[in-house]
Amino acid sequence: MKGIKAFTLAEVLITLGIIGVVAALTIPSLVQKYKEQATVTRVKKFYSAFSQAYTMAINENGTIDTWGLEDSEIDVDEDGNSGYSDSSLEQYEKFFNIIGKYLQKVEYEPIRNTRGKGFVMSDGTQIIAIWLQPSRCTGNGINHSDTYCGDFYIKTDNKPARKDDGTFNSNVFVFNINPYRIFPRGTDNTEFKDKCLSGTDMSRCTGWLILNENMDYLHCCLLYTSDAADD
């Protein structure tokens, strides 16, 4: 049509360049946000399913302190390496043999970089470690529902569970066990700040993820650490 000018090659290239810059700035952020939300969904799904299974196990078998379990122990081998004792690994398996039948599907198989075996849920979530302390877990009424009976760690992908310095990566989450329920670690404000926000133990971010349904703590750790160093 007369009176309408086409874009010049230079204008087209400039426009494409601007689009490319915007995409380069926004797409990584969108991908990261998507991955974080997928992790949130997986952890919350696990928490819901495992909580229900634990409740059913209690209803049929009594509280965990009556399951005939022994306290977990650490052994040190001749090279000075520490790890769960053989008896502790047996208790680990015994615990999940009881609770596993209340879950849709649990596979018991070797887990990379851990001694012995671990449990893998149907969606690939790995239960990589458990620490049982039934001797501290009395189950004496609902008023004692926060009694510590142990804790366990899950991993949401196949990336390493630990950083080079030995601390947990952000793909690891920890839950406490008490006589009547499980609950996420890191709901205590002091623990959340000292462990999660400082980056010294990312597994203690679990409480934030469950309560707030996001992983925004990943984007404020450096800021918190910097502020703490300035105090």
Locations of regions flagged by a protein language model:
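Conserved small/polar residues in nucleotide/adenosyl-binding loops
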Residues: Y224-A229
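N-terminal single-pass transmembrane signal-anchor helix
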Residues: G3-K35
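Low-complexity, acidic interaction segments enriched in glycine
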Residues: N97, Q104-P179, P184
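Short amphipathic secondary-structure patches
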Residues: L69-G118, S122-D123
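Alpha-helix exit/C-cap motif
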Residues: S51-E70
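Aliphatic-rich helix starts adjacent to a transmembrane/signal segment
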Residues: S29-F50, Y54
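Extracellular/mature segments of secreted proteins
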Residues: S145, S203-T206, N212-N214
